[in-house]
């Protein structure tokens, strides 16, 4: 018999994550690597676990994640968004706690573009009055 799995897609900055949740022991695999090997910072790994903590399902599901684009922070945010959406498929009653924690909202903040005549998006060369 086919194993039950729940899917979710998450995005953050320039990252996009496809998440599959399967009932298991709580292992998280990102791009075929354990999360401890893929993300070297504990504080950023905590971001990925937030949906499980909010819904008190930590250790009940294994997450298989394919994530592309961006850096550690963006990828962790995209994964968090995808896990939250997949948990909604598991149980629609999770919508309340996930929504209150702000985990179902796509974070629309993006990198500001560089403007012509400036060094970066807002950094200008030093102004000399005389």
From Swiss-Prot:
Entry GO terms, CC: cytosolic small ribosomal subunit
Region spans: Disordered: 101-130
A Pfam match: Ribosomal_S9
Family, per entry: Belongs to the universal ribosomal protein uS9 family.
Matches recorded under PANTHER family: RIBOSOMAL PROTEIN S9 (PTHR21569), SMALL RIBOSOMAL SUBUNIT PROTEIN US9M (PTHR21569:SF1)
Keyword annotations: Ribonucleoprotein, Ribosomal protein
Biased composition (Basic residues): 111-130
Protein name: Small ribosomal subunit protein uS9
SUPFAM superfamilies: Ribosomal protein S5 domain 2-like
Organism, scientific name: Levilactobacillus brevis (strain ATCC 367 / BCRC 12310 / CIP 105137 / JCM 1170 / LMG 11437 / NCIMB 947 / NCTC 947) (Lactobacillus brevis)
Keyword rRNA-binding: no
Superkingdom of origin organism: Bacteria
